[in-house]
Amino acid sequence: MTRTLPPGLTATAVVAASSANLGPGFDSMGLAIGLYDEIVVETTESGLVVEVEGEGSGQVPLDGSHLVVRAIERGLRETGVSAPGLIVRCRNDIPHSRGLGSSAAAVVGGLAAANGLAAQTDSTLMSPERLVQVSSEFEGHPDNAAAAVLGGAVVAWTAAGAGDPRYAAAPIRLHPDIAIFAAVPQVRSSTAETRVLLPEHVRHTDARFNLSRAALLVVALTERPDLLMEATEDVLHQPQRAAAMPASAEYLAMLRRCGVPAVLSGAGPAVLALSTETELPAEALRYGADHGFAVKRMSVGHGVSWTSGVAVRT
């Protein structure tokens, strides 16, 4: 039985950006980054109001097709509650269409906000495992979604078998000596646009290469960061996407020539560097600035959080 929420309940969710793939871990590895979106939702008697500040303002829909709204509605169904009306306020710091998991953050944040509303009843809330499953259903793959839910670095997978896909993830401990740098350009790209550049089939030798590097990447991230250069090598998706984002491909190559383990962040065009140095080489910083990249050291992102309460009117 579905319970109708009364007007005046509020919930706030805070969700991190994320970087998927990390080189060889295509669709299976992710890392939460300390850049956050905030979603504030309030139940009302009727209607829908969507407000967006920051990234995406004036560009994303302000109706029921908004990804956050769709995720909230799915989350309410998951927890057995409904809301006659909603006010949804999104404060976005995660850049859109740059490969930093903005869509996963929208979905995970919306689901967490729904948990925050449902927590004010005796409903059963979505567990972290369920949040990974439902958010990955939106995304179609669990790497960004799992990182946004759990925080830190994750290995994610899709269980084999008949029926609907079952998604799961496990956190891995990131070595404390690893520093994270994000280089974000002004240009945009979509995962859908760059995914079509990938071949339907790959050579056995290429598959073997990436399997070895993905396995090595877990070792490098957790115990042996000195192996990150070799561990972040990839032949399955980054070379194929290079023509669609030449500036990012050149910056990635330039960083690696400087000895910096660098990868495309997700489908790009942002570039992620994982280094044991506290600063990038001066040459790399100059190149980034000259070619329109905003380069910044980032912290490791925490898992999605939510709070709930009652709206106060003044």
Curated annotation (Swiss-Prot):
The gene designation is: thrB
What is this protein's record name? Homoserine kinase
Per the record, the pathway is: Amino-acid biosynthesis; L-threonine biosynthesis; L-threonine from L-aspartate: step 4/5
Belongs to which family?
Belongs to the GHMP kinase family. Homoserine kinase subfamily.
The record's section on PROSITE patterns has: GHMP_KINASES_ATP
Its annotated function is as follows: Catalyzes the ATP-dependent phosphorylation of L-homoserine to L-homoserine phosphate.
Q: Which domain of life is it from?
A: Bacteria
Listed under catalytic activity are: L-homoserine + ATP = O-phospho-L-homoserine + ADP + H(+)
GO molecular function terms listed in the Swiss-Prot or TrEMBL record = ATP binding; homoserine kinase activity
Primary residence: cytoplasm
